[in-house]
């Protein structure tokens, strides 16, 4: 591996001593901070050189920023300010030995003035999040970038440019900023008024780190969009000029070229669990998209119609207009068929736009997608994207066409839209007199040039190369024009990664839309935990620069499977399904292990068909005795309660069955023959166990004559609805079951008047949308319809609900580690419950309820969590016990099991077994171990034992297992059913787990083993 410049031990220690500062020096993590969303070809990338930072810091307040700046000045360490890294100009690319200052925790609203219509925010707040919060107060931003789902307020000001949605009415972003607070390179804090913003606007953090910004706002009003189809660029120009001449009060005006429409039509459709979703076919013409305030729509429409007609254009169908308006934040969709893009972004006069497009078509032969945004009535920004493949050498040639577009824009009075590391030679034309202002300021305040070096001056060799390419552009263009992109997905496996995963990794736009909604990233806060970071890591694996180990495998396993990323990805990449593929590739293949607790669950599922280490014979004990005679031996409808509702939260199963009975639904039930649905094994990567479970359940349902399976658990519903059919098709198993959730059945009965709640439940309730039935299934309204039908219930909504609902934070995340991240994610969810003023949170998922109850207890939050079916049963006059105490009791056991199964604690457990292991060794080895008493030979034994232990353990484990079980029983107070099963479950768990962890355990146990040989004494051991 190439040398990476590190911080000195002294400077690193001092940095770590800054109280509250989050620091990451993990090399793998640092690699993920080497770039922004821009993608350079191999040749100019060499000129940029190494870009691995020495550390990443995440300050959480101004004081920490000031302390880091003082530290950087003391040790002459460059600082690279970074927010969302959603630009492509190289503005956040580090230099060797630098520290990236990531401002993701500066994401709050500081003050909102509804009278003056202003808001002061921290720089790391994401535009879409800000707009969401402002809308709740009756306000809205004046404008936002096309990257609003990920980009930040501070990033837009620092990068410059500032053209986006709303620019037609309000101009550039800087013109809508009232003030900004900045920490300068000497550590001073200054506040810049609007007239002084030139010091930081467009300076890319070279003159200071923005810590707050005050924006001017507008009153909230919905926008009405209009779509127009034009055949020629001349028509586009005429329409836009007439709109200006006639004074149409537009908020936004923009368009795409015919190539953009054609390529968008070629992009694979968005899929939902493998099923393609419909999308309209765009006319392969110039498509104009205009928007105005809703109150002005009638007037605008009246004036617009003759303009469109006189230009020879036509209005777009409403469905296409609405689709494109909803899709307006997704300009990079065509990267899906690239999988790379050659970008060029220029600003040109409107009155030359027809000439620019006519010449572009003549000049650049590969397809060029253009998304245009009007800055005002006089200028327009053109985002030009040429699809290609960065893995190919010819990408270097194709990239030169971006210079052809730049030169073309200049010919017609335009310029580059922005500068940065990659276009530093354009800085004087883009920023004009500001360059000298910035350089003078830096000479005074940043003599060491520590704040984001190279972003103003650029890289001399790169500037020379680009200058030469511009000088010889006609010749260079000839070579670039010979390149023909393939414009389709092409899946090829690479370095052990499946072909589709490799393609998606390169397709990823690195825009960060997924990062902003990722539950895991929201809890952890480092790039490697985000989908964007995972795609970047997979690219490195494909290129042979990284190899999967257990730590990174765990990173993929920890995904909460909430699917929020799938709903926000602008390329419609199947992100969560791809992580599911990787779980199989990593775990089911045997290369890595799943989380240890899941091995215990797998052993339990294999033996007793459930994940709770309980006995199958107890599975149906939840059934109310008066209902037993009503449950049919055979029926076309079956109720499938699942493991958690059967063994832990039994009120869910009992209430669900009573609701079905009250609704007149005749059903059968597998009873003791029911197995876990298998989804825990599927998401844990134990596909072998999942397949066995699936085959069992399908066979048993067929034996009972079932055609429709009704589930109460969303995960069980998802399994029967989606995963079983997919796997059955793959395995050639006949599958003709329909899957429903009980809320669908009951809401239908209520709507038809076939069922009615009779008893009031006087509570203000809010409903939690479970991911596995909400985003994964689109079932949002039936549960709400049930609650609304109960007398006395007042239903209130949380800030995030339905498709945007927050995950409870469970699934593998809770099982993955002691002091789990799930408690933090659960707190985030419960804070929303408290904020909406509800008396309790209602959920329909057993696992969500379990997670929220445990999180409430861990965070000291007195927020009741109620089951939907139990609340509904109360509406029928049926009272059921609250199982929260039993939930906490069971979690206390599993929490200790999870803690015990961590490698350091497993090593401690093994240490306690050293005397028995020594006795169990073959006689020759026992004799050899005694050599450790000989001076000097103990060091030899210390080297020998770690590689020997994995070889010896298969011999030793059966002999020491009884002792291990006794030690575990001493440490963990288990319920009787679990204690009785441990002699069967623990050996199987160890069999699957130890081969992966023994090398680490051996290193930790060896010193204690040598000590025991010498002294017959063990070190003091404490786990709990």
What are these regions (language model features)?
Residues 1-70, 87-117, 262-267, 272, ...:
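N-terminal flexible segment immediately upstream of the FAD-binding catalytic core
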Residues 502-505, 535-728, 734, 749, ...:
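Iron-sulfur-cluster electron-transfer modules
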Residues 91-107, 135-139, 161-174, 213-220, ...:
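A glycine- and small-aliphatic-rich helix-loop capping segment at beta-alpha/alpha-beta transitions
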């Amino acid at each position: 591996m190439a040398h990476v410049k590190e911080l000195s031990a002294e400077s690193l220690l001092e940095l770590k001593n800054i109280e509250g500062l989050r620091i990451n020096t993990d090399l793998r993590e640092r690699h993920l901070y080497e770039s922004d969303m821009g993608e350079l070809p191999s040749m100019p990338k060499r000129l940029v050189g190494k870009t691995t930072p020495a550390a990443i810091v995440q300050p959480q307040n101004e004081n920490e920023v000031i302390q880091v700046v003082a530290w950087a000045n003391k040790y002459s360490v460059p600082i690279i300010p970074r927010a969302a890294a959603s630009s492509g100009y190289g503005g956040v690319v580090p230099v060797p030995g630098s520290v990236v200052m990531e401002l993701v925790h500066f994401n709050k609203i500081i003050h909102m003035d509804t009278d003056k219509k202003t808001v002061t925010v921290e720089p790391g707040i994401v535009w879409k999040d800000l707009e969401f919060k402002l809308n709740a107060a009756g306000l809205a931003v004046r404008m936002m970038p096309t990257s609003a789902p990920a980009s930040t307020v501070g990033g837009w000001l620092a990068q410059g440019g500032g053209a986006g949605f709303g620019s037609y009415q309000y101009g550039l972003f800087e013109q809508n900023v009232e003030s900004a607070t900045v920490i300068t390179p000497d550590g001073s804090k200054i506040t810049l008024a609007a007239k002084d913003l030139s010091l930081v606007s467009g300076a890319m953090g070279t003159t200071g780190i923005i810590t707050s910004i005050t924006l001017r706002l507008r009153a909230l009003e919905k926008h009405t969009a209009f779509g127009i189809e034009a055949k020629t660029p001349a028509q586009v120009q005429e329409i836009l000029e007439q709109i200006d001449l006639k004074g149409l009060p537009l908020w936004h005006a923009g368009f795409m070229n015919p190539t953009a429409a054609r390529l968008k039509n070629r992009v694979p459709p968005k899929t939902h669990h493998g099923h393609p979703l419909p999308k309209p076919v765009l006319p392969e013409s110039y498509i104009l998209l205009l928007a105005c305030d809703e109150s002005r729509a009638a007037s605008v429409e009246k004036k617009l119609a003759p303009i469109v007609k006189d230009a020879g254009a036509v209005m777009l169908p409403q469905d296409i207009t609405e689709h494109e308006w909803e899709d307006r934040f997704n300009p990079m969709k065509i990267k899906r068929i690239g999988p790379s893009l050659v970008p060029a972004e220029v600003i040109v006069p409107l009155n030359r736009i027809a000439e620019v497009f006519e010449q572009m078509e003549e000049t650049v032969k590969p397809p060029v997608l253009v998304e245009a945004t009007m800055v005002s009535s006089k200028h327009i920004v053109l985002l030009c994207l040429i699809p290609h493949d960065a893995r190919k050498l010819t990408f270097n040639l194709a990239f030169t066409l971006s210079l052809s577009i730049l030169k073309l824009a200049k010919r017609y009075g335009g310029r580059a839209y922005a500068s940065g590391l990659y276009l530093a030679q354009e800085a004087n034309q883009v920023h004009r007199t500001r360059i000298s202002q910035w350089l003078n300021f830096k000479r005074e305040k940043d003599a060491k040039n520590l704040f984001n070096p190279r972003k103003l001056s650029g890289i001399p060799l790169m500037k020379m190369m680009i200058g030469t390419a511009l000088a010889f552009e006609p010749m260079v263009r000839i070579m670039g024009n010979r390149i023909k992109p393939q414009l389709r997905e092409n899946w090829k496996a690479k370095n052990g990664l499946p072909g589709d995963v490799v393609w998606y990794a390169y397709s990823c736009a690195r825009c960060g839309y997924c990062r902003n909604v990722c539950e895991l990233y929201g809890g952890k806060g480092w790039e490697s935990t985000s989908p964007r970071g995972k795609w970047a890591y997979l690219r490195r694996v494909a290129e042979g620069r990284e190899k999967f180990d257990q730590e990174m495998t765990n990173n993929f396993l920890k995904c909460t499977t909430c699917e929020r990323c799938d709903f926000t990805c602008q390329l419609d990449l199947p992100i969560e399904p791809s992580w599911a593929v990787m779980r199989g590739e990593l775990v089911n293949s045997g290369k890595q292990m799943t989380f240890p607790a899941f091995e215990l669950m797998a052993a339990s599922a294999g033996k007793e068909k459930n994940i709770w280490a309980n006995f199958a014979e107890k599975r149906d004990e939840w059934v109310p005795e008066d209902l037993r005679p009503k449950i049919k031996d055979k029926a076309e409808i079956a109720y499938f309660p699942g493991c958690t509702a059967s063994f832990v939260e039994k009120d869910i199963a009992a209430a669900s069955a009573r609701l079905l009975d009250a609704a007149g639904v005749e059903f059968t039930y597998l009873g003791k023959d029911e197995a876990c649905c298998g989804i825990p094994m599927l998401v844990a990567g134990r596909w072998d166990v999942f397949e066995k479970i699936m085959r069992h359940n399908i066979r048993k349902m067929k034996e009972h004559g079932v055609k429709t399976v009704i589930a109460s658990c969303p995960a069980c519903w998802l399994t029967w609805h989606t995963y079983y059919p997919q796997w059955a098709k793959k395995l050639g198993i006949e599958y003709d079951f329909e899957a429903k959730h009980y809320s669908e059945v009951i809401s239908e009965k209520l709507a038809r008047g076939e069922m009615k709640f009779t008893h009031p439940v006087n509570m203000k309730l809010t409903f939690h949308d479970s991911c596995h039935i909400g985003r994964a299934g689109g079932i949002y309204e039936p549960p709400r319809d049930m609650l609304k039908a109960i007398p006395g219930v007042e239903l209130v909504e949380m800030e995030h609900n339905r498709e945007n609902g927050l995950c409870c934070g469970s699934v593998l995340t809770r099982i993955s580690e002691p002091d789990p991240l799930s408690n933090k994610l659960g707190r985030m969810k419960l804070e929303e419950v408290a904020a909406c003023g509800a008396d309790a949170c209602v959920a329909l998922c057993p696992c969500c309820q379990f997670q929220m109850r445990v999180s409430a207890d861990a965070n000291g939050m007195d927020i009741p969590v109620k089951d939907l079916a139990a609340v509904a049963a109360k509406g029928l006059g049926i009272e059921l016990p609250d199982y929260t105490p039993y939930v906490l009791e069971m979690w206390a056991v599993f929490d200790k099991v999870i803690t015990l199964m961590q490698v350091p604690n497993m090593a401690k457990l093994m240490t306690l077994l050293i005397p028995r292991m020594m006795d169990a060794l073959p006689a020759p080895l026992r004799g050899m171990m005694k050599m450790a008493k000989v001076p000097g030979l103990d060091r030899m034994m210390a080297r020998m034992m770690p590689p020997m232990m994995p070889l010896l353990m298969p011999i030793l484990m059966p002999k020491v297992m009884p002792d291990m079980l006794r030690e575990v029983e001493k440490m963990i107070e288990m319920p009787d059913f679990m204690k009785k099963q441990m002699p069967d479950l623990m050996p199987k768990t160890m069999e699957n787990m130890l081969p992966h962890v023994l090398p680490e355990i051996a290193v930790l146990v060896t010193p204690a083993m040598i000590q025991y040989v010498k002294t017959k004494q063990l070190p003091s051991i404490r786990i709990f």
